[in-house]
Design a protein with these regions (language model features):
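Extended terminal and domain-junction accessory segments
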Residues: 2-72, 183-225, 293-510, 516, ...
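Signal-peptide-cleavage-adjacent N-terminal segments of secreted and extracellular proteins
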Residues: 33-114, 120-122
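Acidic-aromatic/histidine active-site loop/patch
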Residues: 74-77, 81, 98, 102, ...
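N-terminal edge beta-strand
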Residues: 89-115, 238-254, 456-488
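Aromatic/His-enriched, Gly/Pro-containing loop or helix-boundary segments
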Residues: 99-111, 142-175, 205, 297-300
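Short tyrosine-centred short linear motifs in exposed loops/low-complexity segments
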Residues: 116-117, 162, 170-176, 256-257, ...
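Asparagine-centered strand-capping/turn motif at beta-strand->loop junctions
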Residues: 123-127, 263-267, 493-497, 502
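A cross-kingdom feature marking solvent-exposed beta-strand/loop segments within repeated
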Residues: 144-163, 284-312, 472-477, 545-563
Length: 621
């Protein structure tokens, strides 16, 4: 016989349940519900931790235009200050060149959303004879790996005069950007900001700044004119060919306030690192690649293409105008360029004095790890992530360990891998394998056993031509490495340091980007002579820092080895590649297959497919 409930229990229990239900209903009632009709205009808002995610709808119309045309710019080059603010007048470096625009904007639209908002981006390709995909740099896409935007890996390219709709969750807060992935360096100009903010209560550094304004974005890109000369653009603008011929990008601040600035180096055909500094001001570093770090104050920063840095600028100087300077690294003797912007206090009059650069004492460099740890040069090894290294990654060994040797091979005979007119028979590779894209997207394969026996490969299974010791044999295949879901992974990247490998004789650095994951930088070490690298250097790879920096893009210096670790928690096909279009599209890349097909999120049934087609055998009448 069950025990009889007391009168108190009979009354109190339902009352407690009723109170809990009432609280839940009140929270739901007061929390705005996502509206499927939301547009991008109402996604740029103060973020709140109790708010429902919004569905943010955008339309991207991609077109081919020209910079500084007479029709759009209306002869403004005769009076350069008239060019600023003219609709559809694209300044660039002041030269006439074909460019690619989104919604007739250059750079493309900046997307400002809150954490976990859902982006619905309808891409309309109006380019004649040019396909395109868009990659959402910094976003893991855990729910929608098919939206990663890697051609022939996660999707078919968006063909001319067709429309493709990307749907993804902005789950990774921070400073990011979207970009085209086509392998065409001309289309590297197709990019825009993707800023994912979080609520003030969840933002770890919110007390360190007063303002986080959309206009305080600094997006750098490398621009190459028709004559082959390169320069740096700041938000699509340059001072022009004749000094301050065109209006400089201006950032306004109010004396006494602290501002969060967001910097991204989006594209760089040369791969040349860039330094950034602001006269008379120090920079308080807050985050790298969207991942928060312990704050560190420096006077200047060096970064490579693909990287993002957030810093706080305190407007604590005299009311004036100050120079913001960006300059390519001294390593790049073939590309010695700089560009400027202006930091203006209290909307200072344009004729007021501009404070130029003074000597800078401390620098943060993400490029290399030489001369670190002192009071002058700070490297990635000197920064600390706010996220502790997981126990699964802190041991001597990991479940999976991969080594990639960056190589260049010369080919002869019929099997050649063409790059450009000056370099017809050279191919870049990882472990001697030049990545070749499949004829249909890997993510659309129906099962784990549906591989292409003639094209798929890994370090243990390669085509017959790859087995030869003859360097003249071309080893091209779809390089795929399988990794168990939730495995701890270690990647070692070896750079022998030959300058010509990097695609620029004066810049021996590579920079690699991993899709779908962030990784911890465990170690990066440069050697006087790469030939001295031995197993002893790599034998003990146990992390010595418990909160190594988290990144998705990393510079690989010459004559060095770099050790990265991550937990493979995101199932799908993820691209690991050199950052420049002319390298990743021509072999210096690999696909990491995380998990099995059953682990992958479902691809929509109507998802577009593509591939080879060979018609039936018949005779023409």
């Amino acid at each position: 016989m069950s025990p009889r409930l007391s009168w108190c229990e009979i009354v109190i229990r339902p009352a407690v349940v009723a109170v809990i239900v009432a609280i839940v209903l009140i929270i739901i009632r007061l929390t705005p519900f996502p509206d499927i009709k939301n547009t991008h205009a109402n996604c740029d808002r103060p973020c709140h931790e109790l708010e429902w995610p919004m569905i943010c709808r955008f339309q991207f119309i991609i077109e081919s235009r020209r910079s500084l045309t007479r029709k759009s710019c209306d002869h403004c080059w005769k009076n350069a200050s008239d060019c600023a603010g003219k609709k559809y007048c694209f300044i660039g470096d002041g030269s006439d060149r074909r460019i690619f625009t989104v919604n007739r904007l250059f750079p493309g639209p900046s997307l400002h959303v809150c954490e976990n908002d859902i982006l619905v981006v309808e891409v309309v390709n109006r380019l004649a004879g040019q396909s395109v995909t868009l990659h959402w740099r910094g976003q893991p896409l855990q729910e929608t790996p098919a939206m990663d935007g890697v051609p022939m890996v996660t999707q078919c390219p968006v063909s001319p005069h067709t429309t493709f709709q990307y749907k993804l969750r902005a789950s990774q807060p921070g400073t990011h950007f979207w970009q085209a992935m086509t392998g065409d360096t001309e289309m590297d100009d197709l990019f825009g900001a993707l800023i994912v903010r979080r609520s003030a209560k969840l933002e770890p550094h919110r007390t360190l700044y007063d303002e986080d304004k959309p206009e305080h974005l600094i997006y750098l890109s490398e621009w190459t004119s028709r004559s082959g000369q390169s320069t740096l653009l700041i938000n699509g603008m340059s001072a022009g060919k004749e000094g301050n011929f065109f209006p400089l990008q201006t950032y306004n601040v109010t004396e006494g306030k602290r501002y969060r600035f967001r910097v991204a180096y989006t594209t760089g055909h040369s791969g040349c690192p860039v330094s950034a500094q602001i006269s008379s001001h120090s920079l308080l570093i807050l985050a790298l690649d969207g991942q928060p770090t312990e704050p560190k104050k420096v006077d200047s920063i060096h970064l490579v293409p693909g990287e993002r840095i957030d810093f706080v600028l305190s407007a604590d100087q005299a009311i004036n105008r100050y120079t913001i300077r960006f300059k390519t690294s001294d390593w790049c003797t073939d590309l010695n360029v700089e560009n400027f912007a202006i930091l203006t206090y209290n909307s200072s009059h344009p004729s007021s004095k501009i404070i130029t650069m003074a000597s800078q004492s401390t620098v943060l460099t993400t490029v290399q790890d030489t001369g670190c740890g002192g009071h002058v040069t700070h490297c990635l090894s000197d920064l600390k992530s706010l996220e502790k290294l997981p126990d699964k990654l802190s041991g001597e060994k990991t479940d999976v360990s991969l080594t990639f040797d960056l190589q260049e091979r010369n080919y002869s005979g019929d099997q050649t891998f063409e790059f450009d007119e000056l370099d017809l028979r050279q191919g870049r590779s990882l472990n001697g394998i030049t990545f070749t894209f499949p004829s249909s997207p890997l993510l659309l394969r129906p099962s784990d056993n549906s591989s292409d026996e003639n094209l798929d490969c890994n370090d243990q299974k390669v085509p017959a031509t790859c087995a030869s010791d003859e360097m003249s044999n071309f080893c091209g295949c779809t390089h795929i490495i399988s990794i168990p879901l939730m495995a701890s992974v270690q990647i070692i990247i070896l750079n022998p340091g030959a300058n010509h490998l990097s695609g620029g004789k004066s810049n021996p650095n590579f920079f690699f980007h991993l899709h779908g994951q962030h990784f911890y930088l465990i170690q990066r070490r440069e050697l006087a002579e790469f030939a001295n690298l031995s197993e002893s250097h790599l034998k003990s790879t146990k992390p010595t820092i418990t909160n190594s920096v988290l990144k998705d893009t990393i510079s690989i210096p010459p004559k060095s080895f770099t050790i990265l670790r991550f937990i493979a928690s995101n199932p799908g096909y993820w691209f690991l590649h050199e950052g420049r279009s002319q390298l990743w599209s021509r072999g210096m890349s690999v696909v990491l297959k995380v998990g099995q097909r059953d682990d992958f999120p479902d691809v929509p049934e109507t998802f577009p497919s593509c591939g080879n087609w060979i018609g039936p055998e018949f005779f023409l009448a």
